[in-house]
């Protein structure tokens, strides 16, 4: 029973983020433990703030300690493993303790300050009320007189296998009246339990045998010893699109459960969760939980509580699911591991890969990365023996990879076709419709038209708060900024600079949908983008409708490009890829290769062969041609040579230090001063490999009235480098510069085994 505790408080800035010592009243001492959520008085006014206990019996900083106001119930206490993750995130991502706490527990499980009924005493209140339901268990024998009814006998028989909730019993035809009657007779006992919610109860358990091909079985056999070993291991499952990686997942999960352990499955986007959940629920039944941001707060809390209470053996979800309170983990799967969505863009700026690696180490689990287009860093580590490499080279069922045609859009325009859909693609879609097959079209631009440009001065109409063009959305008849949400309603028709006429140009998913309707009036067209999937459960509903042949053509952004499996999709078209091909950043080619390979792989996954058309103005581009050939190994050799020459990951770590503020000149000065301080601190450690680039304006210079600059630091991501950044942040804070910019540190994580081999010339 601790008498003093060290507490990390909410809303602390990075430089004041430490443990503050508080005394514990006698009535709270038996409730406080490491990981407890508490309410504390903070600052001169002793205002109530949330906090988490990270040390017990802490040494007092002075004799006059303040007392804790309140302590949350034990059910809100962070588990030892989640506590260690909080410290891990704090050390690795430059976040505050409480930012890390908010990442590992969902909103609904958190508490907030309020006052007691007396209107004075500060107390804790739960963000959401936890729902409960009745649970029944056998408490005695069923009397034979009067003669038991059939329903009573059925209830007793069901409960002979253990406690059941009211919901479960009602699903079996046992009414509450029957149960209450048995409770009155002393046959049953009723208690309140936290309500568990099965979001996919309609999916029937099939539990069919998992039949693998010879190649899949070989992959499973290669991974099995790592799964069965109590030590942590990592592996990369590299398989061509349609090779049946998911079947290998299912077999590994089944063995993991047989070993008495649990499994965690990560997917990069919400749109990919329905198909993965369908496979898992059919195979493993009710004990599958879901964690992603499309769930409402109540659903997410109930799923989280189900996991915490041990009611789930498998958790599937997006990036944040890596923090699920799952214990005794034996297997962590990161599907489509190359996707950038596994990195958080807000504090804490973590990589799900790195957290997964940490949890695998904590649990002695197998971390399995999987992809048809692995990240260059992951494949480099696997090829060099730092992680196990397992390959699947054949499509499931022996189907060939899709045939790919590259169409030169310059020649298309010269021949008199001004449309964004080439004649070759139009003809292929028409033939596909006649064959009663389905088509997927990728166009990675939302909206109707992507910019408004003056015919006279050529000025492009930009968002007043951001340095990006406004996008016309025809369905809403307004211009929207996709970064800050600013609107122009109605859309202007004259240039605000010179008064000339505005010409709307570009081609987004809304316009593609309209053009398809004109070309193929008999076809049913589905649009999948952020606008059409904004409603709750929209991803699941629309994908299910496409699977049921309620649509013939699906056009969408990146969410249609990967992980989807529709047996009647035999044609894929790629539109507007050039904007990504010439994007900034050292990963631009990798991203384009992955996107094209993945979307082309959506076709021809069943008995019918697949065909794909890539439209471009650069038909000789080697990346496009390698993607068309689905030749990852050749692409990797080209990419790794470029990375080595330019000193990019995996040959170094990258740390991007961002600066933002309302006045551009002050942001630029702050970035330059920080760069100077970093150089001064680095001079004290001349053996520390470091290369600083910048400061330079951000790739988008202004977002939401905030100007952005950045320093790019090529480094070895280890404790010494992170300590260097911290000391520089401290020096920067102590200088008390007027109107300093906000500073954000974002480390690009690479496999540590690679980083140790860093050598700067």
Question: In which residue ranges do the predicted regions lie?
Answer:
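Short secondary-structure junctions
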Residues: 13, 520-523, 678-691, 735-740
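A short, contiguous, amphipathic alpha-helix enriched in charged residues
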Residues: 4, 17, 32-34, 424, ...
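Inter-lobe coupling/hinge segments of SF2-like helicase ATPases
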Residues: 207-213, 217, 221, 230-668, ...
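Solvent-exposed, membrane-proximal periplasmic/extracellular interface segments of envelope transport
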Residues: 60-75, 696-698, 702-714
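A carboxyl-terminal module marker
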Residues: 676, 680-703, 707, 743, ...
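A general secondary-structure signal for short beta-strands and their flanking turns/coil
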Residues: 2-4, 17, 46, 436, ...
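Accessory, non-ATPase domains that flank or precede helicase/AAA+ motor cores in DNA-metabolism machines
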Residues: 1-371, 383-399, 681, 719-761
């Amino acid at each position: 029973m601790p008498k003093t505790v060290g507490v990390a408080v909410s809303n602390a800035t990075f430089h004041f983020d430490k443990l503050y010592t508080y005394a514990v009243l006698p009535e709270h001492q038996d409730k406080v433990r490491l990981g407890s959520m508490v309410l504390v008085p903070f600052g001169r006014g002793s205002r109530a703030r949330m906090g988490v206990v990270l040390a017990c019996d802490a040494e007092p900083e002075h004799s006059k300690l303040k007392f804790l106001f309140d302590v949350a119930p034990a059910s809100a206490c962070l588990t030892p493993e989640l506590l260690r993750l909080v410290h891990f995130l704090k050390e690795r991502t430059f976040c505050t303790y409480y930012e890390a706490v908010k990442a590992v527990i969902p909103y609904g499980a958190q508490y907030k300050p309020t006052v007691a009924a007396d209107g004075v005493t500060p107390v804790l209140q739960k963000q959401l009320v936890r729902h409960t339901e009745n649970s029944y268990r056998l408490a005695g024998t069923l009397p034979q007189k009067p003669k038991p009814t059939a329903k009573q006998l059925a209830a007793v028989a069901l409960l002979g296998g253990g406690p059941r909730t009211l919901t479960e019993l009602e699903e079996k035809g046992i009414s509450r009246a029957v149960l209450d009657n048995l409770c009155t007779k002393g046959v049953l006992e009723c208690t309140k339990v936290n309500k568990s919610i099965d979001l996919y109860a309609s999916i029937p358990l099939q539990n069919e045998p998992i039949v693998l091909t010879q190649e899949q079985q070989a992959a499973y056999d290669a991974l099995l010893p790592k799964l069965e070993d109590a030590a942590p291991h990592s592996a990369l499952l590299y398989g061509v699109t349609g090779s049946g990686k998911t079947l290998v997942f299912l077999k590994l999960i089944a063995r993991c459960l047989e070993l008495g352990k649990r499994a965690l499955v990560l997917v990069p986007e919400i749109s990919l969760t329905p198909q993965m959940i369908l496979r898992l629920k059919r195979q493993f039944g009710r004990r599958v939980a879901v964690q992603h941001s499309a769930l409402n707060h109540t659903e997410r809390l109930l799923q989280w509580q189900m996991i915490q209470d041990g009611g789930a053996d498998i958790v599937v979800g997006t990036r944040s699911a890596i923090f699920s309170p799952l214990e005794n983990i034996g297997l962590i799967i990161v599907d489509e591991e190359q996707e950038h969505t596994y990195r958080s863009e807000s504090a804490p700026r973590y990589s799900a890969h790195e957290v997964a690696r940490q949890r695998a180490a904590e649990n002695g689990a197998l971390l399995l990365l999987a992809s048809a287009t692995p990240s260059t860093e992951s494949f480099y580590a696997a090829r060099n023996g730092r992680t196990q490499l397992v390959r699947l080279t054949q499509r499931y069922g022996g189907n060939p990879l899709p045939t790919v045609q590259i169409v030169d859009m310059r020649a298309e325009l010269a021949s008199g076709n001004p449309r964004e859909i080439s004649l070759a693609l139009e003809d292929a879609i028409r033939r596909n419709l006649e064959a009663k097959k389905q088509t997927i079209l990728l166009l990675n631009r939302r909206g109707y038209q992507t910019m408004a440009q003056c015919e006279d001065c050529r000025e492009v109409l930009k968002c007043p708060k951001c340095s990006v063009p406004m996008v016309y959305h025809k369905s809403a008849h307004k211009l929207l900024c996709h970064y800050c949400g600013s609107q122009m309603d109605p859309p202007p028709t004259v240039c605000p600079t010179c008064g000339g006429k505005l010409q709307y140009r570009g081609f987004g998913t809304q316009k593609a949908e309209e053009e398809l309707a004109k070309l193929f009036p008999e076809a049913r067209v589905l649009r999948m983008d952020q606008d059409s999937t904004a409603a709750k459960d929209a991803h699941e509903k629309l994908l299910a409708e496409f699977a049921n042949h309620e649509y013939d053509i699906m056009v969408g952004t990146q969410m249609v490009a990967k992980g989807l499996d529709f047996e009647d999709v035999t044609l894929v078209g790629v539109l507007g890829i050039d904007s990504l091909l010439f994007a900034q950043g050292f990963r631009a080619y990798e991203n384009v290769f992955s996107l094209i390979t993945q979307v082309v792989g959506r076709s021809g996954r069943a008995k019918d062969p697949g065909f794909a058309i890539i439209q471009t103005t650069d038909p000789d581009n080697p990346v496009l041609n390698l993607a068309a050939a689905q030749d990852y190994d050749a692409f990797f050799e080209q990419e790794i040579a470029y990375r080595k020459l330019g000193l990019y990951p995996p040959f170094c770590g990258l740390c991007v230090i961002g600066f933002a503020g309302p006045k551009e000149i002050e942001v630029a000065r702050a970035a330059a001063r920080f760069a100077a301080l970093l150089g001064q601190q680095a001079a004290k450690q001349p053996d520390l490999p470091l290369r600083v680039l910048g400061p330079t304006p951000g790739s988008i210079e202004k977002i939401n009235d905030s100007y952005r600059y950045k320093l790019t630091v090529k480094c070895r991501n280890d404790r010494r480098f992170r300590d260097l950044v911290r000391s520089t942040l401290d020096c920067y804070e102590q200088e008390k510069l007027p109107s300093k910019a906000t500073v954000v540190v974002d480390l690009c994580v690479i496999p540590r085994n690679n980083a140790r081999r860093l050598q700067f010339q």
